[in-house]
C-alpha cells in the first residue's frame, strides 16, 4: 500500500458512520418554534391595524399621487382635563368643499408639540355619524373599540418624538371631499391636563385636483 492509500484509509477510519436519522429536536428548539409562530401572528395582527402607508409626510418628502393635490388644516385643541377627550370634525375651506365629489386618497395627522408640552396624548381619525355630538362618552367609546389606528404621542426630552405622524389610506373606500365632514380628529389626554399652548395638530388631506383661481394647482 502506498502512502496516499494509507492516508485515505486513515481518514475513512476516523469518519463516524452516518446514522439513520438526526436526533429529536430539543425542548428549546420546540419552544423557539412556538415563540416564532406567536411573533408572526402578532406581527400580522399589528399590521392589520396600522395605516396602509406610513411615510414621514406625503406633503414634504413624497409627491402627491398623479392628478392629486392636498389641503391642510390646523387644529389647536382647547384645554383638555386629565383623562378627558376632545373631538373636531374635518371642516375644509368653502373653496374646496365646492368640489365635493372630488376623491380623497389619504389623510395624515402631524403632531406638533409646542415648547410647554409635557403630556401624553392619543390621537386618531374616525368616521362619525352626522348625529354624533362628539361627547366625552362617545369619543371614549371610539378609542376603546380598536377600530382605527391610534398615534400615542409622549413628551420627549428632544422636544419631538420620533414618530409624530399617522397616515390613513382612504382610496379603497372611494371617499370624497363631501365625506370629510363625516370624519373627526379625536384627542385623549391620558396622564395630565393638556393646556391650550401645548399642542398643534396639522391635518393634510390629499384629494383630486380642483380649479383654483381659474387655473389648476401644480
Swiss-Prot record:
Biased composition (Basic residues): 11-21
Keyword tags: Acetylation, Capsid protein, Ribonucleoprotein, RNA-binding, T=3 icosahedral capsid protein, Viral nucleoprotein, Virion
Keyword Cell wall biogenesis/degradation appears in the UniProt entry: no
Protein name according to UniProt: Capsid protein
Family: Belongs to the cucumovirus capsid protein family.
Cell compartments where the protein resides: Virion
An annotated GO cellular component: viral nucleocapsid
PTM sites of type N-acetylmethionine: 1
Source organism: Cucumber mosaic virus (strain FC)
Amino acid at each position: 500500500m502506498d502512502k496516499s492509500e494509507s492516508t485515505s484509509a486513515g481518514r475513512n477510519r476516523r469518519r463516524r458512520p452516518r446514522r439513520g436519522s438526526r436526533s429529536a429536536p430539543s425542548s428549546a428548539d420546540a419552544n423557539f418554534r412556538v415563540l416564532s409562530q406567536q411573533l408572526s401572528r402578532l406581527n400580522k395582527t399589528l399590521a392589520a391595524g396600522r395605516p396602509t402607508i406610513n411615510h414621514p409626510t406625503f406633503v414634504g418628502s413624497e409627491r402627491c399621487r398623479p392628478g392629486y393635490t392636498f389641503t391642510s388644516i390646523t387644529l389647536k385643541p382647547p384645554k383638555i382635563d386629565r383623562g378627558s377627550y376632545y373631538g373636531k370634525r374635518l371642516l375644509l375651506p368653502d373653496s374646496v368643499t365646492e368640489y365635493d365629489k372630488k376623491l380623497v386618497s389619504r389623510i395624515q395627522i402631524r403632531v406638533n408639540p409646542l415648547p410647554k408640552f409635557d403630556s401624553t396624548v392619543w390621537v386618531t381619525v374616525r368616521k362619525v355619524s352626522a348625529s354624533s355630538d362628539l361627547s366625552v362618552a362617545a369619543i371614549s367609546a371610539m378609542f376603546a373599540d380598536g377600530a382605527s389606528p391610534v398615534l400615542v404621542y409622549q413628551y420627549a426630552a428632544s422636544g419631538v418624538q420620533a414618530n409624530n405622524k399617522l397616515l390613513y389610506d382612504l382610496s379603497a373606500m372611494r371617499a370624497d371631499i363631501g365625506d370629510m365632514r363625516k370624519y373627526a380628529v379625536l384627542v385623549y389626554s391620558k396622564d395630565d391636563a393638556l393646556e391650550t399652548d401645548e399642542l398643534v395638530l396639522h391635518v393634510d388631506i390629499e384629494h383630486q385636483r380642483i380649479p383654483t383661481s381659474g387655473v389648476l394647482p401644480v
